[in-house]
Structures are given as structure tokens and as C-alpha cells.
Amino acid sequence: MAADIFAKFKKSMEVKFTQEYGSNKQAGGDITGKTEKFLRLGPEQDARKQEMIKAGKEIAEKRGIAFYNPMMHMGAPLGQRAITPYTISGTDIVAEPDDLHYVNNAAMQQMWDDIRRTCIVGLDMAHETLEKRLGKEVTPETINHYLETLNHAMPGAAVVQEMMVETHPALVDDCYVKIFTGDDELADEIDKQYVINVNKMFSEEQAAQIKASIGKTTWQAIHIPTIVSRTTDGAQTSRWAAMQIGMSFISAYAMCAGEAAVADLSFAAKHAALVSMGEMLPARRARGPNEPGGLSFGHLSDIVQTSRVSKDPAKIALEVVGAGCMLYDQIWLGSYMSGGVGFTQYATAAYTDDILDNNTYYDVDYINDKYNGAANLGTDNKVKATLDVVKDIATESTLYGIETYEKFPTALEDHFGGSQRATVLAAASGVACALATGNANAGLSGWYLSMYVHKEAWGRLGFFGFDLQDQCGATNVLSYQGDEGLPDELRGPNYPNYAMNVGHQGGYAGIAQAAHSGRGDAFTVNPLLKVCFADELMPFNFAEPRREFGRGAIREFMPAGERSLVIPAK
């Protein structure tokens, strides 16, 4: 496998640096060459830049105020850097650089939309209220009727009330509710259109793990309209859902809208039986639930679905790294901390041109050769998580990555910032240690050691302050204090020291996943999230995040929440 990935890495470098793209005159040359002439071709060398320049001029003329003009960039007239394409790792998709900015990529937007607009609400507490407080009978037939009512109401349609204004179905066609349960008998009694079938969506072994964890409980997977969460925020998701749940219970079970039991149903939907994707952030960061800063690394690992469809532990982890770098670096930190150009090329370093993949699969072979197949799928084959093991694997991984950069200067040119290289080297080391040990915090330890080895070798990691969390992070891998020593799976973007710097969080998420994909676990932290997103009806395919980003870049991805129905046609 490592040889195949190495060949793919070299092909990505050749596509990027030895083949002409647009009119960048990159044809010929050698990906191991150490010198290259700067041709100073300017932004016009690239087709997408030409399109953007043309659009900028037209918009400026139309609105009468200056707009996009790349010559305002002090470096653009020199045109020193060749504008080269990116190959999406794990695919053959070749993309324009600008098309990997999340603003220009509908798939990236939809990935976050699909997470932000989702919540999970238990049904059992509501059913107990109906039965014990109101004497109502709850049967598969009444549940089916309730779900039919709810799928009418959830997009924003009226029940119980008189003829109210409603949302147009064509604007909210991505909104729906399904249920799932660990009770096969109940699942068989519910109309199949409303059920996420655990036995169908997961392998037999994974389904058994999930059903054992969920037990006889029943849960609603709720996806409110994309257009609603885009207009409001992530905290609106549970409020919107709770309102429609309450109205649907009243209608389906012929309740009196003003009776006291309605308050219990409301409390269950809004609080007691609610599972949000992300936690609320503290006041200084001022974000409600279901915003990126509160989405833990373990939750993201469970949202990504590659583990359902692949038995390759490294690939499963790398898909989470890609999804995490896009979400945490491009959308969260890239807007919250930076804005504008953002941090796109921090993230692309981890999911393009197969550089991280090449390092990781080298590590897999190294581990399997030295530790008797410890990086293969399984639980009995793992090596004990000791400092000696972490030192060995992380050092070998980092040195291989450094040597690859030095052997292929094109890879250095691709990852032109030291902090990009730091991310990739450390992510490979951390994922490798987690795969070998089945222990995510051993993976974190490998990450931090990689940073030390990298800095010792090259003298720096990235821009000033980039390495702050990496210098102090090792002390907290096994700290007894809860806020410092959390398992990696429970950490997130707002964990102490993680909240300030780009280029880290996607790697931490991949490490969390690697510990469990290496073991073949059905989920990382929460089986409810794993099942909720095991649904082919969702616009974004969470089984292949990197490929979806590529489809977005080449403009093949169809998003939800568009407003074309209610705006003038161009």
C-alpha cells in the first residue's frame, strides 16, 4: 500500500510542477530538482484568476465602486509564484487553488450546514409523558402517524394552529426527520421511510456494537432546513426542532395545546433528551451550541462515516483529518481569527497532493514490520502505549517526512510555510502512534514529540507563536486535571491552548479517529452521532469528505438551501 501511495504522491507533484496548468509554463522539469526559475507571469496565468478579474471589473463598473483587482496585492505584479493546481488526496480530482476556499466551494459549505442544522432528540421521555401523565397509548401506529406529522411540520408547516403562513417546500426540501433504535423489533414495526436501519448501514460487527450501546432507546435524527440555520445560527437548530416536535405531538396525539404536559414535552425536546453536535462556548467567544468551536474531536470523528465503508484504518483517519482541517481551520479559525483570505492553505496541506497520505502509509508499513501488524485492523494486535513506543514511531515518522521534503523540494514549494509542514509531520506521527496503540493520547504524545524533533532538525516550526501549544502540550497528555488532561476524543477547538492557533485541530481529530479505526470500533465517542449521519439522504456524503471537497471545487456538488425559487432569474 505504501508504494502505491508514494507513486500517487509523486504523480501529484508531477501534475503540480511538471505539467502546464493554464499558461503557467510549468511543463517539464524534475520533482526532485532544487532550482527553478521564477517566470513572473502574474495572475493571468490561471484560468480561474482570469474569470475572477473579469467578474471584478464588471461588478466594479456596475456598482460604481472599486472591487476585485489582484494588482492591488503588492506581490501580484511580480507574479513570482507559479499558480499550480491541487490534487485532492485519495482521489484523482485536480482543483484550482481558489476553488478550495470555502466561500468558493459549495461542498465545504454544505458539510458544515449539515452538521450545524442537525440535532438528536430522544423519544422515550416524551412517550413516558404521554403514557403516564395523559394516559395516551403509544404504539408503532401512533409513532408512524407522529413521524408523518413531524415531517410535514419540521420544514416550517402548520399543524394545530389555524391556516398560518408556511415555508415553501421547494426551499426546505433538505429538511426531514428519521428515527433509529437498538430495538430491532420496534424498528421493524416503523414505516421504513422514517428509519435509519442500523443493520443495513453498518457491518454486522459494527451494528452489534452500536445496538448494544443504544439499547432499547429510540432517537430522532433531526435536520432542520439549511436555509434556516444559515439565516440564524447553530443554536437555533434545537429551538426550531423543539417547536415543531411539540406541535406535532399535540396534533398526532390529540392533546390540548395548553395543558401542563406540553411543558414536559418541550423540556425534553429542548434540554433533557437533546443531543447537540457542539457545546456552547464561553461568553468571550460568544457562540451557542452547534457552532464549530464547540464541536469536539470525538464528535467530528463520529460524524464522518468512512469507518462504515472502509476497512483501512489509515484512510478512515485521513478522511477525518481532511474534514477537520477544512472545518476547524478554514471555517472556524479562518473566519473567527482571520477572515477574508483565511487559513485555506493550512487545511489544503493536510488533504491535497497526497503528502500526508504518503507519510502516514509509510508509517503503517513501518509499524506493521516492527510491531507485528499493530497498524492493521484489530484489538489483539495493538502494541502497549509506552513512551518508548511513541518515541520510536513518532521519531521515525517525522524523520521520514523531513527527508521526503528535502528529497522532493517540490513538496516544500507546495507546503511553502513552516507551519504547514509542522501540521503534516505531526499529524502523520500522531495518527501512526494512535493506530499502533489504539490510544488517542498516545497519538497526542506522538504529535508533540514530532514537533520537538521537527524544531530540532529545522530550527523552527512556523510563524512566531505558532508552536506555543506544541511546546506545552506534552505536559497535558496525562495530566490529572480534567480541563487539561482530557482524552483527545473529548477535547475540542476550545480546549485550553488549542483555541488560539490554526493548523492543529484537524490533526487532533484524526488522531482521535485513528485510535478507534485501528481497533475497528463502530464509533469513537457517541453511537448516536454515528447512526444519525449514516444516512444517504443527506446532501453531503460524510463517507468521503475529501472527494466531496473535490466535487465542490470542480463545481459538481449540488448544495441545499438555495433561494433561486424566490429571486429573479438571471
UniProtKB/Swiss-Prot annotation:
Q: How is the cofactor bound?
A: Binds 2 coenzyme F430 non-covalently per MCR complex. Coenzyme F430 is a yellow nickel porphinoid. Methyl-coenzyme-M reductase is activated when the enzyme-bound coenzyme F430 is reduced to the Ni(I) oxidation state.
Question: Does the keyword Membrane feature in the UniProt annotation?
Answer: no
- Lineage, top-rank taxon, reads Archaea
Q: PTMs?
A: Is methylated on C5 of Arg-285 by the methyltransferase MA_4551. This post-translational methylation, despite being not essential in vivo, plays a role for the stability and structural integrity of MCR.
Query: Could you tell me which residues carry 5-methylarginine?
Result: 285
Residue numbers binding coenzyme F430: 161
Q: Which cofactor does it need?
A: coenzyme F430
Indicate which residues the UniProt annotation says bind coenzyme M: 346, 464
| A molecular function (GO) term | metal ion binding
**Cell compartment(s), UniProt:** Cytoplasm
Listed binding positions for coenzyme B are 239, 270-271, 284
Q: Which Gene3D superfamilies match?
A: 3.30.70.470, Methyl-coenzyme M reductase, alpha/beta subunit, C-terminal, Methyl-coenzyme M Reductase, Chain A, domain 1
Q: In which pathway does it act?
A: One-carbon metabolism; methyl-coenzyme M reduction; methane from methyl-coenzyme M: step 1/1
What NCBIfam families does this protein map onto?
met_CoM_red_alp (TIGR03256)
Instruction: Explain the purpose of this protein.
Output: Component of the methyl-coenzyme M reductase (MCR) I that catalyzes the reductive cleavage of methyl-coenzyme M (CoM-S-CH3 or 2-(methylthio)ethanesulfonate) using coenzyme B (CoB or 7-mercaptoheptanoylthreonine phosphate) as reductant which results in the production of methane and the mixed heterodisulfide of CoB and CoM (CoM-S-S-CoB). This is the final step in methanogenesis.
Protein name in UniProt: Methyl-coenzyme M reductase subunit alpha
- Organism, scientific name: Methanosarcina acetivorans (strain ATCC 35395 / DSM 2834 / JCM 12185 / C2A)
